[in-house]
Swiss-Prot record:
It is found in: Cytoplasm. GO terms for biological process: nucleotide-excision repair; SOS response. The gene is uvrC. The UvrABC repair system catalyzes the recognition and processing of DNA lesions. UvrC both incises the 5' and 3' sides of the lesion. The N-terminal half is responsible for the 3' incision and the C-terminal half is responsible for the 5' incision. Its main location: cytoplasm. SMART domains: GIYc. This is UvrABC system protein C. Pfam families: GIY-YIG, UvrC_RNaseH, UvrC_RNaseH_dom. Gene3D superfamilies: GIY-YIG endonuclease (3.40.1440.10), UvrC, RNAse H endonuclease domain (3.30.420.340). It comes from Mycoplasma pneumoniae (strain ATCC 29342 / M129 / Subtype 1). Residues 17-94 form the GIY-YIG domain. PANTHER family: UVRABC SYSTEM PROTEIN C (PTHR30562:SF1), UVRC/OXIDOREDUCTASE (PTHR30562). GO terms for cellular component: cytoplasm; excinuclease repair complex.
């Protein structure tokens, strides 16, 4: 049974029967999920259905508050939802991966435009040509060729007044030296537009004339250069990806497959009936029914075309209501597959989506199973839930090279970006003192950056009651900090994970044949490996470090001065102190 607080219950009861957006928040005020709805009341209450999937329950159990934004219609809601997701990047939302679109050539919208190659599509700011599905390295060669054909500014404005690197290579028009004119520059810009919009005939004619002129002057090296440029231009034109040069029709097909809270989406882009590229992504979703999955797909499509070129026609299998919503929002023709050929293409796209889902299925299912193990652990410890846990371990080769390690898991998934390593340099030696130092620094960091990395629900220490008591004492010195559940993960005489130790020194034996035992063993091995790896790195650095750096007040710059004058460490020790002072003072 899901329990909600009084504030949330009141807001749910008074949710509006109007279109708009809703923002689920946790008890710290962080946005967990942003959604849109034709009827906000019906949508938000749907989340609290007791028969929802585990992924949905994982979201609902974190909800402590909700915020509504009432709008005129679903189009406005779709637009605002996209902006809110971009602003908050909620952990439960489907968020597009950065730099995962097609490549475009584009002319920047500046006083002195430049030719660039990139993925981000911002039609209102720049003039784009594409998309291209060729490899980035091949397009980079073509880009270099275009820069030779159309030598627009490449150097930064602050470099003007003296010849830039490209000027010396004769690859720019001399903007840095003030040798160009606005008229000449705009003519070059129009040449690029002519090349992409109307084909290369004008460029080829120009290169042929340059070749003939160079040959007549018996400058055969230059003539060969212009001939090579002609061949490169023809190669560019013959590439499949340049079909857009005289294109009249652009048509995208989007197919998707959804199974057990995993959504795989594939996009095929066609120009004049030629496939120019494929893009696919796989996501985990908290939604688990058809309407909500369609809503998530509509959100994806709207986001996708905010950074990619919008086709004239989009074919996707959706309800008439969502087709109409996308058509009105994107201002294009959005349809179901109409004939046998379109149905065949869409089925191929769906097959690609299914393959993408199957490829990543194991990883998603493992995370899902791990999340369920978190609930089993919560039941074992007799607490409502454990959404996040952190595990700490200490590793050292000797008393001078000690490293603490912390790994964080949320719903069973390791959050690699939140892993922490602690170099320990304290006077009081011993495992419990090292543990105290790590926990103290972890609490301090949580206070300073609570929103980025708050303390977890559960803290696991590698060890028994001695380590637990040490950690408890550290938390006692921070009365305003909420102490997480603390347990120890003890090992047997064969150094294998064996049982759980609680704060009152009672133990809980774990069935060795359960997923819970396998999970705890895995995370204990992962933190042990992480700690040892970082301890080894610290020792390795120390071995190759100049011993002079161990002297208090001596830094790398001072050591370099001494090395320049004495060359070997032996000479440092044999020379007179006064001589060292003289050298250092120079």
């Amino acid at each position: 049974m899901i329990i909600v607080n009084n504030t949330l219950a009141f807001k749910l009861k008074n949710a509006p029967h109007k279109p708009g957006c809703y923002l689920w928040k946790d008890d710290a005020g962080q946005v967990l999920y942003v959604g849109k709805a034709k009827d906000i009341f019906k949508r938000v209450h749907h989340y609290f259905n007791p028969n929802r999937s585990f992924k949905t329950r994982a979201l609902v159990e974190r909800i402590a508050d909700v915020e509504y934004v009432i709008l005129k219609n679903e189009n406005d809601a779709l637009n605002l939802e996209a902006k809110l997701i971009k602003q908050y990047k909620p952990r439960f939302n489907l968020v597009l991966k950065e730099n995962n679109g097609y490549l475009y050539f584009f002319i920047t919208a500046s006083v002195k435009p430049t030719l660039e190659l990139g993925r981000r599509y911002e039609f209102s700011k720049n003039k784009y040509f594409g998309p291209f599905a060729s490899s980035k390295f091949r397009l980079r060669d073509i880009y270099d060729l275009l820069l030779k054909l159309f030598p627009l500014r490449k150097c930064a404005p602050h470099e003007r007044g003296h010849p830039c690197f490209y000027y010396q290579l004769k690859m720019c028009m001399g903007q840095c030296m003030g040798e160009d004119t606005p008229e000449r520059y705009q003519t070059t810009v129009k040449g690029i537009e002519q090349f992409f919009n109307h084909g290369p005939e004008q460029v080829l004619n120009h290169l042929q004339q340059q070749e003939i002129k160079a040959s007549e002057q018996q400058n055969f090296e230059a003539a060969r250069h212009f001939l090579d440029l002609q061949k490169a231009v023809l190669e560019l034109v013959n590439m499949q990806q340049t079909a857009f040069i005289k294109a009249k029709q652009s048509h995208d097909f989007i197919g998707y497959v959804f199974e057990k809270n995993v959504l795989a989406i594939t996009v095929f882009a066609y120009v004049d009936n030629q496939l120019i590229g494929k893009n696919q992504q796989v996501f985990e979703l908290p939604q688990d029914d058809e309407k909500e999955v369609e809503s998530a797909l509509v959100t994806f499509i709207y986001h996708y075309y905010s950074t990619n070129k919008i086709p004239k026609t989009l074919t996707v299998s959706l309800s008439e209501e969502n087709l109409s919503l996308l058509a009105n929002s994107l201002k294009i023709n959005v349809t179901q597959p109409k004939n046998g050929e379109q149905k065949s293409i869409l089925q191929t796209v769906i097959d690609n989506a299914r393959y993408a889902l199957n490829t990543k299925w194991t990883g998603f299912i493992n995370n899902l199973n791990r999340a369920e193990v978190h609930q089993q652990l919560a039941q074992l410890l007799q607490v409502p839930s454990i959404q996040s846990l952190e595990i700490i371990d200490i590793s050292f080769y000797d008393k001078d090279h000690v490293v603490g390690a912390m790994l964080r898991y949320e719903n069973g998934k390791r959050m690699k970006a939140l892993s922490r390593r602690y170099n320990i340099n304290i006077d009081h030696k011993g495992d419990t003192n090292y543990m105290a130092d790590v926990v103290y620094r972890r609490i301090i960091s949580s206070i300073q950056t609570h929103k980025q990395l708050p303390l977890s629900d559960l803290l696991i220490v590698d060890g028994g009651i001695a380590q637990i008591n040490t950690v408890t004492k550290v938390f006692a010195s921070f009365p305003n900090v909420t102490q997480p559940i603390i347990i120890g993960l003890a090992k047997n005489t064969r150094h294998q994970t064996d049982h759980i130790v609680l704060t009152d020194n009672t133990t809980i034996n774990i069935d060795k044949n359960t997923p819970l035992f396998a999970y705890l063993t895995t995370i204990q091995e992962e933190v042990d490996s992480f700690a040892k790896h970082n301890a080894f790195k610290r020792v390795s650095r120390a071995r190759f470090q100049n011993p002079l750096l161990q002297i208090e007040g001596v830094g790398r710059k001072t050591v370099q001065i001494l090395l320049d004058n004495f060359q070997t460490n032996a000479k440092h020790w044999s020379c007179f102190f006064e001589r060292i002072i003289t050298v250092y003072s120079c």
